Curated annotation (Swiss-Prot):
Biological role: Has a plus-end-directed microtubule motor activity and functions as a motor for transport of vesicles and organelles along microtubules.
Residues with PTM Phosphoserine: S1054, S1057, S1416, S1454, S1487, S1573, S1603, S1610, S1613
Domain of life: Eukaryota
Record-listed N-acetylserine modification sites: S2
Native source organism of the sequence: Homo sapiens (Human)
Subunit structure: Monomer. Interacts with KIFBP; positively regulates KIF1B microtubule motor activity. Interacts (via C-terminus end of the kinesin-motor domain) with CHP1; the interaction occurs in a calcium-dependent manner.
Comp. bias (Polar residues): 1554-1566, 1640-1658
Record-listed Phosphothreonine modification sites: T647, T652, T1075
Descriptive protein name: Kinesin-like protein KIF1B
Effect of E1674K: In a pheochromocytoma sample; loss of ability to induce apoptosis
Amino acid sequence: MSGASVKVAVRVRPFNSRETSKESKCIIQMQGNSTSIINPKNPKEAPKSFSFDYSYWSHTSPEDPCFASQNRVYNDIGKEMLLHAFEGYNVCIFAYGQTGAGKSYTMMGKQEESQAGIIPQLCEELFEKINDNCNEEMSYSVEVSYMEIYCERVRDLLNPKNKGNLRVREHPLLGPYVEDLSKLAVTSYTDIADLMDAGNKARTVAATNMNETSSRSHAVFTIVFTQKKHDNETNLSTEKVSKISLVDLAGSERADSTGAKGTRLKEGANINKSLTTLGKVISALAEVDNCTSKSKKKKKTDFIPYRDSVLTWLLRENLGGNSRTAMVAALSPADINYDETLSTLRYADRAKQIKCNAVINEDPNAKLVRELKEEVTRLKDLLRAQGLGDIIDIDPLIDDYSGSGSKYLKDFQNNKHRYLLASENQRPGHFSTASMGSLTSSPSSCSLSSQVGLTSVTSIQERIMSTPGGEEAIERLKESEKIIAELNETWEEKLRKTEAIRMEREALLAEMGVAIREDGGTLGVFSPKKTPHLVNLNEDPLMSECLLYYIKDGITRVGQADAERRQDIVLSGAHIKEEHCIFRSERSNSGEVIVTLEPCERSETYVNGKRVSQPVQLRSGNRIIMGKNHVFRFNHPEQARAEREKTPSAETPSEPVDWTFAQRELLEKQGIDMKQEMEKRLQEMEILYKKEKEEADLLLEQQRLDYESKLQALQKQVETRSLAAETTEEEEEEEEVPWTQHEFELAQWAFRKWKSHQFTSLRDLLWGNAVYLKEANAISVELKKKVQFQFVLLTDTLYSPLPPELLPTEMEKTHEDRPFPRTVVAVEVQDLKNGATHYWSLEKLKQRLDLMREMYDRAGEMASSAQDESETTVTGSDPFYDRFHWFKLVGSSPIFHGCVNERLADRTPSPTFSTADSDITELADEQQDEMEDFDDEAFVDDAGSDAGTEEGSDLFSDGHDPFYDRSPWFILVGRAFVYLSNLLYPVPLIHRVAIVSEKGEVRGFLRVAVQAIAADEEAPDYGSGIRQSGTAKISFDNEYFNQSDFSSVAMTRSGLSLEELRIVEGQGQSSEVITPPEEISRINDLDLKSSTLLDGKMVMEGFSEEIGNHLKLGSAFTFRVTVLQASGILPEYADIFCQFNFLHRHDEAFSTEPLKNNGRGSPLAFYHVQNIAVEITESFVDYIKTKPIVFEVFGHYQQHPLHLQGQELNSPPQPCRRFFPPPMPLSKPVPATKLNTMSKTSLGQSMSKYDLLVWFEISELEPTGEYIPAVVDHTAGLPCQGTFLLHQGIQRRITVTIIHEKGSELHWKDVRELVVGRIRNKPEVDEAAVDAILSLNIISAKYLKSSHNSSRTFYRFEAVWDSSLHNSLLLNRVTPYGEKIYMTLSAYLELDHCIQPAVITKDVCMVFYSRDAKISPPRSLRSLFGSGYSKSPDSNRVTGIYELSLCKMSDTGSPGMQRRRRKILDTSVAYVRGEENLAGWRPRGDSLILEHQWELEKLELLHEVEKTRHFLLLRERLGDSIPKSLSDSLSPSLSSGTLSTSTSISSQISTTTFESAITPSESSGYDSGDIESLVDREKELATKCLQLLTHTFNREFSQVHGSVSDCKLSDISPIGRDPSESSFSSATLTPSSTCPSLVDSRSNSLDQKTPEANSRASSPCPEFEQFQIVPAVETPYLARAGKNEFLNLVPDIEEIRPSSVVSKKGYLHFKEPLYSNWAKHFVVVRRPYVFIYNSDKDPVERGIINLSTAQVEYSEDQQAMVKTPNTFAVCTKHRGVLLQALNDKDMNDWLYAFNPLLAGTIRSKLSRRCPSQSKY
């Protein structure tokens, strides 16, 4: 029967009086063995269910069929436990629950026989079974002990001699036991009942004297049940000993629920310590049992804390040991006790998982005899089964065996103590009392007490005391003597000892004044019939009426035992005087006994709640309180009997006269009303709080006024000084020398460029109008309009020409006032109901918003009519909707940026912008009759009119129905552009051009043929599908072109100056691109010369040699444009048609017939032929040389919402999809507590930048006294992330290490403060939450020593973190499964020469485990990282990447600065009624500008591709004989700037402009006539690159011994250009050959580099220190700046979140200049950073390289120089390092990951080599 689980039963009691008075509700439900509890605070929450062995419903009355009585509880639990006891097992029953839950009632019950508890019934049945035994061989003995555990002290309740606290000892064989605990022999149930009563009396007396209650102490009643059996065959006696432990645990109440204070609170803490330890033991045992099946090996964590409390120490065998254990959990059904009841249920649920390994406690000899008998029986059965039963009785072997067996058993009996000791040594902790009893039969075991004399014992003690450790030895000797003396006692001696103790106990009680029965005993329940007496009352019902004191005739004195005169009733405790009071019992004349109470002087005596100082006559039932703790009820039997006879109907008290009644009566009579006292105290606290709050508010208001006055004074000073400075500047400007023409040109160029930037203005528009957008969306959602509004940026290009209504009024001017394509902020209106998209201007949005508000106000009145109309129409009198498009634009091709955009916009505006009178609408009107079979209507008209009527279409213009715009049925699919330069020669060309949408998406392809023809030539026969029109005559007027400024210079890239590039803002404004005055001069000169090309006949003179005879001025010329096919158009568009026109024409375009688009992949065959006749003019020649024809493709939208009956979209608008993933939220710094509030200083120019690599560690205190870094879980696999796995309740420290490159500007001075706060269980920060901010104590801050050659700085500081000071439950408890705790940490660090501290902020993720839990990384992590990093503290850290910028303070007096700092309120945060319905939708912000910039760059690239394709097609047709001038005008994309290594399109365009301006003769492309000059140029560039490679390479890497031809760098490289902007030739060989760390000649350009270009990447960590940095030869800002200027630096630290996209990862070999060996490291490229690890198993970032500031170099000469293949170099400002890949392919992949443009350039160069020289 070993391995059985603990039996667990729960029992719910009825409501008590307190719960009934509070009208409590029952929250416990039971069904079978399942128990459920309902949370009264959250009734909707599902009930928590628990399953136990027994669930007893005792909440109702016994009449309930489900009611569980005392007998049922005993029959289920008590009988089973008693049966186990007779079998020889140890048995334990303990009750648990809060105070008043019914534990004692279940265990002890009441005096009524039907309500007896488990203990009385078990004891009674025990003796019934003993008495019913008829086996003469069996004999029984029962011994009991009764002890109390209070505040970790043990008291003997049965022996009055043991007045002190007993010691708990542990014996190697017996285990834990209580020294000197009385073990009394009993022979009947009456003896046990008397001993229980005696123990309760002793417990009551002690508790009353010490102001205790039984509910605050643990009581353990132990019965040692011994069964002896005499075996007649062997003449041996065997024993089975069972120990029955009956435990009544203390209440598990919480301090706040019982109102405990002071001493009571301390006592409760000690009691809860025992219960807490018991809970730990139960949890540990349950966990061990659960893990047994998984792993049989005992772990170090399988420690059971038995010794943490006396209770668990003594009950060790009963909890998971050699015992059969049952637990009864008592529950309160009331909702006010929900927390305690739930805790009890969880306690019991854990207990049922414990398994006990119980064994039968019998002697080894008895076990051996039994096993031998079983073996003999088995052998006899076997012989009989084999047919040899007749020889069993006569076989001599068997007789000999039997004889030898008996002999052996006798020998074992004589020496059984040896076998016993050997057996117990093999099985420690399972020693039985019966086995110890067998020790007495051995002579050797008795020698210590009987055969050894006193002298020998004394000599032994002296010898032991003289040796080291003698005291311990003598203690163990005495302990053994006591045990042996106890075991040697016979049964008769034990009975005599029990009787003597009983006499002493009763004498002691009698001496104390406790009443004596007629038989002389004080025990048992009795009530005197005549004598007046006092009965004690106690808070514990079991202690009430337990003590009875007689009031004898005459005087009965009450006082302390040490009084001068003997006291009849002895009391002790606080406030009891030596002579406290006197009871006088006198008989009156009538024979009635009158008892009078006379209090002594200064004694506290109360009668019925009133303090008495004079004699008082007592009546039966009076309550008497002596001192503070002794409460009695006076009983006068005769007086009570007489009163009942006089008044039979006397009223009985409405409630029992108990201890609670007496205490409440005392408070009432003393005038103490607890409720009033609490209310009075609460009012006092409220008054005090209001007073202090008023004082604080007054002080705060006074301080605010003081600060405001100071700020106003300072502001006046600043304004006065700024005004004076501006006046001085103006005066100085007037006195300056007048500008020269060149200076005016430079100023004009700069002003035009500055004027073209719009970033700030666009942002102001987005911020300022966000509130209108939000309000429009909110009204749309509330009115269920299914219309969404969002910001969009539109640029006036040929892809998306803007109609006049979207242009602001100030932009509608001539081209001279607006020379650049402008970007406007518009509103994208998505009509989800009609499937249309419109674009409104901001003014139109505001106008419509007024109408929306009016409609919203009239929504109730229009509800009925609007509902009908909205179901039958798709448009109507609704400001939300514009007319939707039936044909949609698919795509378009790129175009130039001149004013033609505006002309094209006026001629053929995009359908999405078109008005009701647009050309596209007219086209739809013309084709309406032909498409009547397709649809009945050509337009969707307003709701209030008939379809297609003029009235309905004019509603908006007339103002009757201003809510709808008419939209065409055809939607623009896209645009394509075809150039006509082949007409110059003439040669026919067939173009396949991309159809590109306004967003830059390719929507299909269009095949167009352009050729020159004779005037009378007929169109070819294309088949039945041909659609042919006649010859159209078009004029190209020179005057018109001049007025319209359609010049070739304005439309060609070669003639554009820098400011005429398309710029939103920041484009072309890169800090790395600096245009020196010489370059500007050249550009302006070229621009001025080009601007005169149209004057006179310069155009024709310049191109006269290249134009054929067919293009003579004034002659007629005819050419043909054939629209062949369209392919790749999405099937959602039907009825596709195409129209085309010239850029300058405003009349009707040339259009094809619509074709059905079945979407099967077959091209749409238009085969539309259009002959065009023109008169040749200079404008026409210029047009065909530089300008295209625009083709617009339109389509019909198949999935029309009328066919789908509208879209039922009731969800709020969602945020639009972005082009890049949104950045992770970054927490704001935690405010400092010791520093003054830092103002957000306006930052000026950044002087230098540093990349910081920061390590965060949390260390915990280990048992060794050292702080070890806590384990970090890196399973997420992303950089700069990790979860700290911490222990609960352990001291911690936070360590932060900052790593960066050395720099003279950056020096950490001190750590001003480290603050932590924002404790939460989710990553997002709740700004509204009020959280305590904790400032940590900095214990160390210092620089760490690194290697001698290290160019990195390591700064580390450490702080003490006590998480309990946060007073946060999240930090104090064990984190539930699946939950994580987040905390924000901010470090304020002081830097030299900075006016304010720098702030490093990090969000830390943590999980808390129990204090004793063994934490290790997850299994998958260990298998992934291996043993090297899963166990090393080196991996227990979380990294962070930061960018530190040291900036100047901004110039407050500059008007430009004041303009840029103008305060534009971000209205997106303003509340709008109904915005809560938008479900997270937000207006677009600054990111929209960047996305639009990307769109423009994408369109620019598409445009360049189309132009290049046309140029290559024409060159192929002409056989590479295309003139140079035409290549200049048509193909700037093939100039040297195309292969530049610049990273943005703007810098590419700038480079192209510079190259064409400086060396216009060198950008001629691949003309066969210039091969020789090209070869010479290549030779010159190769010489330059060779000189750069050999002369400027770092001296640390190699020493160059070869000689190179002497050529000056100034003669080759462009002067004053930024080194990062290299020419075509240099980019081909060494794109970044001017890297500062690898070029010695970089000093020529240092002063021209911006500070942003000087920022660099941080170096790796100390773990691979060989990653050194080579300092650059550069003058730092510290040396260049003045002292006062340098002190004005402001640090700005921004956390960088690495990208989750991995470009490449793998191993690379690193070599530093100062090291001779190569080091292998694992590298991961997450642009723009390169992360360096020690290996692929390393979870911690050891170093980073910022690719945005680093330069990558590669050349074959470099590899030959270092004599190592597959190498390339990476250099930053302070470092240069060589990297080696595995092979050529791997190196090429790494180069592509590091610098894609460089890799592409190298591939392009190598592909042009001959195959014999190709390496790839």
